[in-house]
Amino acid sequence: SLVTYQQIRLVFPTQSYYPKEIVQGFINFCRDYAFEYKVVESLVDVSVSVGQVYITVMEDDLLILLERIRNESLQLGKEIGIISYNETPIKRLLFDGISTISTDFETLGRKAAELVLSNERAKWQNPFVFISRASL
């Protein structure tokens, strides 16, 4: 659970292909629910600390983080937490499971197909799905 950690850190590289609105959504969430937070562009100069939850959007950052956790003998899901952006099959298996937050691809695909078939243009907010696993 997020409440057992002292701070949430979003790792969001400036060169990410993900929309910048993710950062503002993260900040809004943390402020709304009174979480301490920090946005970092890279893990290169960031020390991994007990009591932190890291949200990674890029797979490279997830791997760097997992390697540091292993090298520093930290207990994932107890001393430190991870939430990774976008569900993939490997995340079910890594370290007994990495928690994920993903866009609802089924709804996204269905809505996109409806728009193509009806020759419409529309803008909508697609829902997200959170899957809690051992990393949190």
What are these regions (language model features)?
Residues 1-136:
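Bacterial carbohydrate/catabolite-sensing allosteric modules
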